[in-house]
């Protein structure tokens, strides 16, 4: 019974409430805990903070009322988003022509709004569920998932990203970033329970670690027999304050043409997002010349370009503008229109109310004029291969990238992170690309304006990386992959379904708080799934480790599904 506290906040006695620390202490601890969480992510990589931060929040909620839990969660969420997403300040202040004080105020408002996710999460936790990691962790995952779609979504600062290229990321090909987050949060809460001498929690913790070890030996994909493509990624380093100026447009094209001059003859050349700062109809002679040059040299050319057309829509006669990727050249064709747009980067939420605050952004076609592309777009055709596409912010959406990856041999993302240069934003962005590559078992090439331009393999490792904030050409090989990861097939539903089941059982447990059978039901249901899965993954890892050992001491094995 001690391992599974079952009382809700309303059940606390007056003596227990008197023993609690004043509310100001958990509020401050939660605020600081949320603030330090982002240092677990790129570019700092203090991964252990991703365990410590939620562990402190979990501890602060112990025996607190639902109302107090709301405030504690809001403090945590505010600290998390104010520090973790402060890189938005550069976009709003430097490139949005907004005063410094007002820019900070806007970041505060954003952090307060996003912090409500955690506030509602912790309120629900203390109002309807028993105090146990088996309800805290599922609620955390449900609210991470909600951030991918509520108000178009802002899917940033997930716990699972802290373990990119670290031990627990072996769960990514199985269950995606939410599966990694679930493991992180459950381990964090279990640590608190173990420190409180609830030794039972050593069992699920050990199973999670064992399962991660075994999952690391499972290979869902393997390279195709075809020869890898030779690829050149072009990084133009165009200053954002000059990029859309009419007098600088030709200079921008000259920079990219000159950087590409020695790359013709390679299989693929990739220019970054909106590297052509003109609509396709305004620059047709240039596109025709580049297409002819690419075909002449046997090269495929992929470039970011703003695109407009007149689709059938309710706004009859009104052109629709898109942030897009275009493929031209030898054995290459296709057009991809961006589906997910960046708030304050490509469109302005509540633009009618905020236009007086952000006059410069309203006049920038890269910000205020773009529409969303269709969800059923085909991959680009490159040298008889299918190239899945993602533009900038889209790689933050796991399921969107998964859909594109299912029909692709490899993936490309183009981006312009000059909006956030000199901040943690571009590095957090790159870390997400690494997780998407790991989830889907596909190589990812990333071409950016100012960085970070990189080649990322199907295991999420950075193979090559260009220096940031300078002109560069990054050359590498791009192998086509075949096969599907479990995550690619099943999406987020296994993790979301398991989380929903635990919450349903936890709610039932809270209603029947005085019945030992109900407490055992929650523990038993969780372990019924976790024990065989953890044991299976651990056993699989052991078999692979022993049976596939080679002279160099590195196990190589493939498990085909």
Whereabouts are the PLM-identified features?
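Acidic/histidine-rich helix-loop elements
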Residues: 91, 239-253, 352
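Short, small-residue-biased leader/transition segments that mark boundaries at the very start
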Residues: 2-9
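Membrane-embedded alpha-helical bundles of multi-pass enzymes
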Residues: 13-220, 422, 433-436, 448-456, ...
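A short, well-ordered alpha-helical element
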Residues: 254-265
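Solvent-exposed soluble domains appended to multi-pass membrane proteins
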Residues: 251-254, 269-504, 513
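Short, conserved active-site loops that position catalytic residues or coordinate cofactors/metal ions
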Residues: 41-56, 80-87, 235-237, 265-278, ...
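Hydrophobic alpha-helical transmembrane segments in integral membrane proteins
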Residues: 206-241
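Transmembrane catalytic cores of multi-pass membrane glycosyltransferases
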Residues: 531-561
């Amino acid at each position: 019974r001690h391992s599974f506290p079952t009382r809700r906040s309303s059940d606390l006695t007056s003596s227990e409430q008197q023993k609690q620390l004043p509310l100001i202490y958990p509020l401050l601890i939660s605020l600081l805990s949320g603030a330090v969480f982002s240092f677990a992510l790129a570019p700092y990589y203090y991964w252990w903070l991703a365990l410590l931060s939620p562990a402190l929040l979990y501890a602060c909620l112990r025996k607190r009322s639902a109302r107090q839990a709301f405030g504690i969660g809001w403090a945590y969420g505010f600290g998390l988003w104010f520090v973790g997403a402060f890189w938005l300040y550069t976009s709003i202040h430097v490139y949005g022509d907004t005063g410094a004080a007002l820019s900070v105020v806007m970041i505060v408002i954003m952090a307060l709004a996003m912090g409500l996710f955690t506030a509602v999460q912790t309120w629900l936790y203390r109002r309807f569920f028993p105090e146990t990691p088996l309800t805290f962790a599922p609620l955390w995952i449900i609210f991470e998932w909600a951030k991918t779609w509520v108000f178009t979504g802002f899917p940033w600062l997930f716990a699972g990203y802290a373990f990119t290229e670290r031990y627990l990321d072996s769960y990514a090909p199985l269950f995606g970033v939410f599966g990694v987050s679930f493991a992180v949060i459950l381990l964090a809460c279990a640590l608190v329970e173990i420190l409180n001498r609830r030794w039972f929690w050593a069992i699920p913790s050990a199973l999670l670690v064992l399962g991660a070890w075994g999952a690391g030996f499972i290979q869902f994909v393997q390279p195709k027999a075809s020869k890898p493509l030779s690829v050149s990624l072009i990084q133009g380093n165009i200053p954002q304050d000059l990029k859309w100026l009419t007098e600088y447009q030709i200079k921008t094209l000259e920079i990219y043409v000159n950087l590409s001059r020695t790359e013709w003859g390679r299989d693929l050349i990739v220019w970054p997002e909106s590297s052509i700062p003109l609509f396709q109809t305004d620059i047709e002679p240039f596109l025709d010349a580049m297409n002819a040059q690419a075909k002449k040299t046997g090269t495929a050319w992929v470039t970011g370009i703003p695109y407009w057309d007149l689709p059938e829509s309710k706004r009859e006669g009104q052109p629709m503008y898109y942030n897009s990727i275009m493929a031209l050249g030898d054995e290459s064709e296709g057009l991809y229109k961006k589906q997910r747009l960046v708030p304050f980067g490509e469109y302005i939420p509540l633009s009618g109310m905020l236009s007086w605050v952000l006059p410069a952004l309203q006049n920038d076609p890269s910000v205020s004029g773009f529409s969303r592309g269709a969800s059923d777009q085909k991959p680009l055709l490159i040298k008889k291969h299918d190239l899945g596409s993602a533009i900038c912010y889209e790689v933050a959406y796991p399921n969107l990238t998964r859909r594109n990856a299912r029909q692709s041999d490899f993936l490309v993302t183009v981006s312009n992170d000059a909006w956030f240069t000199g901040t943690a934003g571009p590095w957090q962005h790159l870390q997400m690309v690494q997780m998407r590559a790991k989830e889907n078992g596909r190589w990812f090439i990333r071409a950016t304006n100012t960085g970070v331009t990189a080649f990322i393999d199907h295991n999420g490792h950075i193979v090559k990386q260009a220096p940031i904030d300078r002109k560069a050409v990054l050359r590498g090989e791009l192998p086509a992959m075949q096969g599907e990861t479990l995550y690619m097939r099943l999406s987020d539903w296994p993790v979301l379904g398991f989380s929903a089941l635990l919450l349903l059982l936890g709610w039932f447990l809270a209603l029947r708080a005085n019945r030992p059978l109900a407490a055992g039901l929650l523990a038993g249901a969780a372990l019924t799934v976790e024990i065989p899965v953890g044991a299976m993954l651990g056993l699989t890892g052991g078999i692979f480790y022993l049976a596939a050992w080679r002279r160099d001491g590195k196990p190589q094995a493939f498990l085909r599904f």
